Amino acid sequence: AASDVYKRQGVVAFELSTGDIHIFESRAVTFATGGFGRIFKVSSNAHSLTGDGPGILYQKGIPLEDMEFYQFHPTGIYRLGILLSEAARGEGGILRNKDGERFMERYAPSIKDLAPRDMVSRAIATEISQGNGAGPDSDYVYLDLTHLGAETIKKKLPDITDFVRTYVKIEPINEPIPVQPTA
């Protein structure tokens, strides 16, 4: 048909620095629009990462792929989106639910708290959804470092100690730290 003669596939781009318009023809286009971590309640992502790109594409009927593969860091400081290094678990930190139970033994019996991020994040989410979360809203668990001793915590985990003292007003040598999976 005559209308097919004018059909093109690809991308039309506007170059901001010059005002030039460029046409890139292709059989397929992949949109890599940046992050969307701010769609989650607690995130360490920049405030600009709101998912505008995927949202626009979805509204236009363009299929989105692998959206379920968003990585969560298991030990973000509760409500703040500040990530605590996995070194805390590497040094022997233990995740505990509201009852003080070391729950990772049920989810990863051989590696417990050293399980990969995705396993630990899912385990925390499961504990919370089953009513085992701590706090008035039962929406976090604890990262317990108290058994490591003051010297180990000060020497090997100084950043964690500083973050927690500054932002949560908790002394991690004496009290467990409230944490939750963070986008």
What does each model-found stretch correspond to?
Residues 28, 32-37:
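Glycine-/small-residue-rich beta->alpha transition segments that form the dinucleotide
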Residues 39-56, 60:
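A conserved FAD-binding loop/helix module that cradles the flavin
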Residues 1-6:
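Short, small-residue-biased leader/transition segments that mark boundaries at the very start
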Residues 56, 62-179:
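An anion/pyrophosphate-binding glycine-rich loop and adjacent beta-alpha core
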